[in-house]
């Protein structure tokens, strides 16, 4: 499965997508996607290849199974938490808290019902699966603890503002609970970034090995090109929405990443023109939908490439005030750009990942 992305400073980006394990882990601020399908078909080798498994193949398959719970949890909760945080900060100064003088009181969003409990349960199950990975498991534990603590506070704050209780106590509770809410948001953000980073360190090499395995067992056919497009798409969206304190965009990296996606997608399209009849073979696991699924995958990938190219122009033509000496570009200082916005790139990436997860073609 693929993993959508979170949008950083611009909005909410989607999610990691299970395919992320196999090559579509998401970015930072929006965690895009919510339940994605197709995990097994993304990376699982064909039945005839099972007897050729190397010890590394077996280890990778075990790790992929272990990662599912971690990725599902991130996809389910990271984006909603960032959304409710943005909602709250849209009308409250995070440093001072509510003053009671606000013209508009929006409160915040509640988290999805029972999602935190399901998430933490899934993390516990994944933790028990082999192989042991102390860093991953510690990151998962920290994520579970901080999101559970945050959920309790969010429920309390949501009810307070939803029922307009601030009209009765003149914002007394809103002012009192603000420091706790900020501390909980901060703790979660650290845990969220840490789990993202930890998963990133595992899934990227795992994805590269999966791609090499496909080439070893099948050659550069549809499965290889599909996987390659997903991998390069992930690298590009991450280059355009960096995680961490320095979230300025490295133009050289984004430009190179776009070139990789451009070539990978062109290779898939070229192969498809020559071998599209192979998709109609009844031996294809996705038959009789393979050809239609290929077309939908290709359209979604093309839409993503178009938006990514438009954003590339914005970065390339950024005004001097948005550029730093190290070649990075601050998206917040670019100003209006008719060619594209970072949130559009992330949205198209998330759309692409959802399409990919739902439209397997082999």
Regions from the PLM with identified roles:
Residues 256-362:
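A cross-kingdom marker for long, charged
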């Amino acid at each position: 499965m693929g993993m959508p992305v979170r949008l950083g400073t611009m909005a909410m980006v989607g999610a990691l997508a299970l395919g992320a394990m196999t090559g579509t882990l998401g970015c930072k601020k929006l965690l895009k996607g919510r339940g994605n399908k197709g995990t097994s078909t993304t990376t699982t080798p064909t039945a005839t290849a099972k007897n050729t498994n190397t010890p590394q193949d077996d280890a990778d398959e075990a790790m992929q199974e272990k990662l599912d719970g971690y990725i599902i949890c991130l996809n389910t909760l990271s984006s909603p938490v960032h959304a409710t945080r943005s909602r709250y900060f849209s009308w409250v100064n995070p440093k001072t808290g509510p003053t009671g003088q606000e013209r508009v009181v929006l409160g915040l969003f509640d988290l999805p019902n029972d999602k935190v409990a399901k998430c933490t349960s899934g993390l516990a199950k994944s933790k028990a699966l082999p192989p042991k990975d102390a860093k991953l498991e510690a990151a998962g534990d920290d994520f579970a603890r901080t999101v559970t603590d945050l959920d309790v506070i969010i429920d309390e704050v949501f009810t307070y503002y939803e029922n307009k209780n601030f009209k009765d106590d003149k914002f007394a509770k809103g002012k009192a609970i603000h420091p706790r809410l900020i501390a909980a948001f901060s703790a979660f953000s650290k845990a969220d970034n840490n789990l993202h980073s930890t998963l990133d360190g595992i899934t990227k090499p795992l994805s590269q090995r999966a791609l090499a395995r496909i080439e070893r067992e099948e050659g550069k056919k549809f499965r290889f090109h599909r996987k390659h497009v997903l991998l390069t798409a992930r690298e590009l969206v991450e280059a355009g929405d960096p995680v961490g304190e320095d979230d300025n965009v490295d133009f050289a990296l984004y430009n190179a990443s776009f070139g990789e996606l451009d070539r990978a997608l062109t290779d898939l399209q070229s192969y498809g023109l020559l071998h599209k009849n192979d998709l109609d073979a009844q031996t294809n696991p996705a038959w009789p939908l393979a050809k239609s699924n290929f077309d939908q995958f290709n359209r979604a990938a093309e839409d993503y490439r178009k938006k990514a190219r438009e954003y590339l122009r914005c970065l390339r033509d950024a005004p001097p005030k948005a550029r730093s000496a190290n070649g990075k570009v601050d998206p917040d200082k670019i100003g209006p750009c008719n060619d594209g916005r970072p949130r559009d790139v992330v949205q198209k990436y998330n759309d692409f990942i959802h399409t990919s997860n739902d439209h397997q073609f082999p």
